[in-house]
């Protein structure tokens, strides 16, 4: 059995459910949304599926961020750093690790982490970097499997023509996250949506 500490965080842009692995103090799961019951249900489903593969039972323990319980200082620090990220701040020392995903998905997520605040890249660019021929679909699937929102910044990946494409936690939230990072439509008078385009010349990240 393994303990996973969790807490809900609330910001003006959305709420989140955050899990930290007790034995490593690493962030291992973060999901976005306003419905706490649905967030917790999604987490239970994800960890139950993982449990079938790992043969480990994951024990959920809720910790309030302001709790004075012993041995939760590192947990609180991790949750506070995640909250700052969600609020649009740059945080460089948040400890996380992958509990989910395949080796290919881990490579994809590692590429996403390289995209800086205020920049975007495309599915094709990632496929080319990883040398996956015709790999945009595989990249999209890998991005959609990301279970650590914001820290693994899948909201910074767009289509080759600059349109937003989908987002696991809703396209409307993807727009808000990008605009918070000062990434706008080519015509700033237009709100970012599935039809407007981001200026890749201005915002695209090049390694």
From Swiss-Prot:
The active site is at residue 154. The gene is MGT1. Pfam families: DNA_binding_1 (PF01035). Keywords: DNA damage, DNA repair, DNA-binding, Methyltransferase, Nucleus, Transferase. One of its GO terms (cellular component) is nucleus. GO terms for molecular function: DNA binding; methylated-DNA-[protein]-cysteine S-methyltransferase activity. Gene3D superfamilies: Winged helix-like DNA-binding domain superfamily/Winged helix DNA-binding domain (1.10.10.10). It catalyses: a 6-O-methyl-2'-deoxyguanosine in DNA + L-cysteinyl-[protein] = S-methyl-L-cysteinyl-[protein] + a 2'-deoxyguanosine in DNA; a 4-O-methyl-thymidine in DNA + L-cysteinyl-[protein] = a thymidine in DNA + S-methyl-L-cysteinyl-[protein]. It is found in: Nucleus. Its EC number is 2.1.1.63. CDD domains: ATase. It comes from the Eukaryota. Involved in the cellular defense against the biological effects of O6-methylguanine (O6-MeG) and O4-methylthymine (O4-MeT) in DNA. Repairs the methylated nucleobase in DNA by stoichiometrically transferring the methyl group to a cysteine residue in the enzyme. This is a suicide reaction: the enzyme is irreversibly inactivated. Its main location: nucleus. InterPro entries: MethylDNA_cys_MeTrfase_AS (IPR001497), MethylDNA_cys_MeTrfase_DNA-bd (IPR014048), MethylDNA_cys_MeTrfase_DNAb (IPR036217), WH-like_DNA-bd_sf (IPR036388). This is Methylated-DNA--protein-cysteine methyltransferase. This enzyme catalyzes only one turnover and therefore is not strictly catalytic. According to one definition, an enzyme is a biocatalyst that acts repeatedly and over many reaction cycles. DNA binds at residues 123, 137, 160. The keyword Transferase applies. Belongs to the MGMT family.
């Amino acid at each position: 059995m393994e303990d996973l500490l969790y807490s809900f965080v609330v910001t003006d842009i959305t709420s989140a459910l955050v899990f930290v692995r007790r034995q490593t103090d690493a962030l291992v799961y973060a999901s976005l949304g306003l419905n706490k019951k649905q967030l917790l249900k999604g987490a239970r489903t994800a960890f139950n599926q993982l449990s079938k593969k790992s043969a480990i039972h994951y024990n959920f323990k809720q910790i309030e961020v302001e709790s004075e319980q012993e041995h939760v200082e590192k947990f609180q620090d991790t949750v506070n750093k995640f909250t700052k990220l969600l609020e649009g701040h740059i945080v460089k020392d948040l400890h996380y690790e992958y509990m989910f995903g395949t080796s290919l998905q881990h490579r994809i997520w590692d590429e996403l982490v390289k995209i800086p605040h205020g920049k975007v890249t495309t599915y094709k660019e990632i496929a080319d970097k990883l040398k996956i021929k015709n790999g945009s679909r595989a990249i999209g699937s890998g991005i959609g499997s990301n279970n650590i929102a914001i820290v693994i910044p899948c909201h910074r990946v767009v289509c080759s023509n600059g349109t937003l494409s989908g987002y696991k936690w809703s396209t409307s939230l993807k727009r808000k996250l990008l605009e918070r990072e000062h990434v706008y439509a080519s015509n700033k008078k237009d709100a970012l949506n599935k039809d407007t385009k981001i200026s890749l010349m201005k915002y695209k990240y090049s390694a």
